[in-house]
From Swiss-Prot:
GO terms for cellular component: nucleus; site of double-strand break. It is an enzyme of class 2 (transferase). Pfam families: zf-C3HC4_2, zf-Di19, zf_C2HC_14. The keyword Electron transport does not apply. It catalyses: S-ubiquitinyl-[E2 ubiquitin-conjugating enzyme]-L-cysteine + [acceptor protein]-L-lysine = [E2 ubiquitin-conjugating enzyme]-L-cysteine + N(6)-ubiquitinyl-[acceptor protein]-L-lysine. It comes from Homo sapiens. PANTHER family: E3 UBIQUITIN-PROTEIN LIGASE RNF138. Pathway: Protein modification; protein ubiquitination. Keywords: Acetylation, Chromosome, DNA damage, DNA repair, DNA-binding, Metal-binding, Phosphoprotein, Repeat, Transferase, Ubl conjugation, Ubl conjugation pathway, Wnt signaling pathway, Zinc, Zinc-finger. Zn(2+) binds at residues 86, 89, 101, 105. This is E3 ubiquitin-protein ligase RNF138. E3 ubiquitin-protein ligase involved in DNA damage response by promoting DNA resection and homologous recombination. Recruited to sites of double-strand breaks following DNA damage and specifically promotes double-strand break repair via homologous recombination. Two different, non-exclusive, mechanisms have been proposed.
Length: 245
């Protein structure tokens, strides 16, 4: 399939995955200067939290782009025509239907155990394996995320595979890849649980694989954990009215 895709287009399967959420693109948008592509929601969230720079290469992003990024319509059309393999069950799925497939793919849910989208405080149609979260639970998780922090300001976690503690996200990732790469034991992800949308009852079958797929970046760099999604959305809309078109 990948060979057919490359032969017919200039794209590879990697081009259909967002560098922020590490999932198949949803409503892809493209930066003008560096031509990098992101999910629209991921891009707007990154702009809100990180300023006027591309989330991938730190290239310049215009003020207009920050509010109204350009849709990557060419990529959307390609995603409707070509299929790729589900990363868990290997079933061939049209790229634009991949996220929908994840919602019913048992192997995907057993492997990753959490929502197939970038952080979402209110469960949406793209969520996988999460139950509805109450306001109280969200608040408690946010406080936990803030309290368990290192001197550098980054949250710290305990490894669920050996109980060694005080790891930042990156150190936990490195530790597990070095010491537990082939250890497949059902556990709860401490990073997911600490986040406002985390579900403490959600079990991840392959924790190290989950870390490598889900936690390659610190969510706090892209999302304001003090604000719910609706507040962030409204703020982005208000700011868009101030942009000179």
């Amino acid at each position: 399939m990948a060979e057919d895709l490359s032969a017919a287009t200039s794209y590879t399967e990697d081009d259909f995955y967002c560098p922020v959420c590490q999932e198949v693109l949803k409503t892809p948008v493209r930066t003008t200067a560096c031509q990098h592509v992101f999910c629209r929601k991921c891009f707007l969230t990154a702009m809100r939290e990180s300023g006027a720079h591309c989330p991938l290469c730190r290239g310049n992003v215009t003020r207009r782009e920050r509010a109204c990024p350009e849709r990557a319509l060419d990529l959307e059309n390609i995603m409707r025509k070509f299929s790729g393999s589900c990363r868990c069950c290997a079933k061939q799925i049209k790229f634009y239907r991949m996220r929908h497939h994840y919602k019913s793919c048992k192997k995907y849910q057993d492997e990753y155990g959490v929502s197939s989208i970038i952080p979402n405080f209110q469960i949406s149609q793209d969520s996988v394996g999460n139950s509805n979260r109450s306001e109280t639970s969200t608040s408690d998780n946010t406080e936990t995320y803030q309290e368990n922090t290192s001197s550098s300001g980054h949250p710290t976690f305990k490894c669920p595979l050996c109980q060694e503690s005080n790891f930042t996200r990156q150190r936990l990732l490195d530790h597990c890849n070095s010491n537990h790469l082939f250890q497949i034991v059902p556990v709860t992800c401490p990073i997911c649980v600490s986040l406002p949308w985390g579900d403490p009852s959600q079990i991840t079958r392959n924790f190290v694989s989950h870390l490598n797929q889900r936690h390659q970046f610190d969510y706090g760099e892209f999302v304001n954990l003090q604000l719910d999604e609706e507040t962030q959305y409204q703020t982005a809309v208000e700011e868009s009215f101030q942009v000179n078109i």
